[in-house]
């Protein structure tokens, strides 16, 4: 719905957002043809959005569940919903999401890290939250920790090691780690998800 509203001008958005929404709608049409190699898996899209909305916002007077805004649903749903027809792998291996200050970049990245860390079935993955300085890398890491610590059920699936900025994902044996600009610490690692 978000893509339709943006293209129709109901939701005001910048040029690149309009183009992304138009591509999404065009690709939905192309996916109906046999030679097109991608399809949109509505269930996979809804799975990550539903996961996000089960998370708890720890900040504030009262804890409450996440309510994803339409643009956040579009981002999460597109990343997880578009798949290859041949093997069902995710279509997008990289994405660039640009948001203004205080518009939830770390929040969205925290959702992605929690979901891909333990709940999409990939085993022994490495998820890195990276930045030039450790304090910056810790912003997303801390968001993930807040999600985990504010939900008793979720905390059973993760083990947080704050002293070395690492989270063990107990279901998949994956690891989430905050790293700073020391590129040597990334040598030899294949990231399943890299957050920069």
Spans of features found by a protein language model:
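Phosphate/NTP-binding elements of NTP-utilizing enzymes
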Residues: 1-196
């Amino acid at each position: 719905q978000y893509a339709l509203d943006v293209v129709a001008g109901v939701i005001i958005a910048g040029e690149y957002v309009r183009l992304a929404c138009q591509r999404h709608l065009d690709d939905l049409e192309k996916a109906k043809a046999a030679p097109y190699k991608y399809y949109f898996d509505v269930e996979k899209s809804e799975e990550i959005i539903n996961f996000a909305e089960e998370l708890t916002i720890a900040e504030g007077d009262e804890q409450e569940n996440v309510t994803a805004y339409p643009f956040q649903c579009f981002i999460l749903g597109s990343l997880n919903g578009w798949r290859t027809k041949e093997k069902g792998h995710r279509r997008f291996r990289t994405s660039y999401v640009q948001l203004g200050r205080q518009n939830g970049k770390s929040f969205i990245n925290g959702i992605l890290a929690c979901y891909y860390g333990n709940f999409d079935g990939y085993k022994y993955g490495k998820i890195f939250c990276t930045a030039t300085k450790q304090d910056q890398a810790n912003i997303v890491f801390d968001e993930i920790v807040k999600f985990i610590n504010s939900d008793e059920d979720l905390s059973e699936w993760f083990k947080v090691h704050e002293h070395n900025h690492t989270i063990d994902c107990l279901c998949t044996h994956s690891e989430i780690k905050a790293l700073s600009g020391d590129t040597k610490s990334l040598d030899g690692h294949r990231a399943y998800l890299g957050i920069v």
